[in-house]
Design a protein with these regions (language model features):
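A common structural junction motif
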Residues: 81-89, 198-200
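Generic structural signal of hydrophobic/aromatic residues within well-ordered alpha-helices
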Residues: 22, 84-87, 207
Length: 235
């Protein structure tokens, strides 16, 4: 499929030794990742505990988000590029989600990382919806922001038709990235916009100026590879 492709690869590591090794690789592999042929915007990120959204790090799960010129190149690089092969060789399991951008609002580190596909940015029949949010939290507001997370996690656990979710970040406490995959856009909208903890936290964040930067992006899921929690994602 022509056009830009965004990938999110999640790796799970078991055992203290493998987790310590992977923590070290987060520093060692930054330059090798940047030298990967055809890679555009990219981030290596850790994840949180609970359902993934809490600020306390989960040293067992690490992720790579990357932008590629096409889905074909994305598939080839996430299978064979040195960083992916190195992480995969040590991981208990890994899975990659392939996406095309529908919409993007805001910036990430001063960059506009995702380019919406053409023509009209809408889901095609059979495509699932992925949503990514990213925020830089003001240090003085971090406590207020993170205090809302447990209630949001409880609501997400009860949400209809959410197929995958993970919380990530570059710096614990100060950066939060949320990612989720939904069967239908209507179910995502019901979770995000209906009265409840997520809506209340979002309203307070913008009304009270909790963030120095924020981004919201929607994607069409066009494929997946690998296994997660013992099963193929099936996207």
């Amino acid at each position: 499929m022509a056009g830009e492709c965004v990938t999110l690869t999640c790796f799970r590591f078991d055992g203290t030794l493998e987790r310590v090794r992977q923590f070290g690789r987060m520093g060692l592999d930054r330059r090798p990742l940047a030298r990967t042929p055809d890679i555009g915007f990219h981030r290596m990120m850790g994840t949180g505990t609970g359902l993934g959204f809490r600020p306390r790090p989960n040293f067992g799960v690490w992720t790579i988000l990357a932008v590629w010129p096409s889905a074909e190149i994305a598939q080839e690089r996430t299978e064979s590029a040195p960083v992916w092969r190195r992480w995969r060789a040590r991981a208990a399991e890994d899975a990659t989600i392939f996406m095309e951008t529908l919409t993007r609002r805001g910036e990430w580190g001063g960059e506009a990382p995702f380019t919406p596909r053409e023509p009209a940015p809408a889901l095609r029949q059979g495509e699932k919806l992925a949503v990514l949010t990213r925020a830089t939290v003001k240090a003085a507001r971090a406590g207020a922001f993170w205090s809302r997370v447990p209630a949001i996690e409880d609501a997400l656990a009860e949400a209809r038709d959410v197929r995958f979710h993970v919380g990530m970040g570059e710096v614990p406490w100060l950066h939060q990235v949320t990612f989720s995959v939904w069967d239908r856009e209507e179910d995502m909208a019901a979770f995000a916009h209906a009265a409840g903890p997520h809506r209340e936290a979002a309203d307070d964040a913008f009304r009270r100026g909790w963030f120095t930067e924020s981004l919201f992006a929607r994607f069409a899921v066009i494929g997946s590879a690998g296994r997660w929690r013992g099963a193929a994602l099936g996207f």
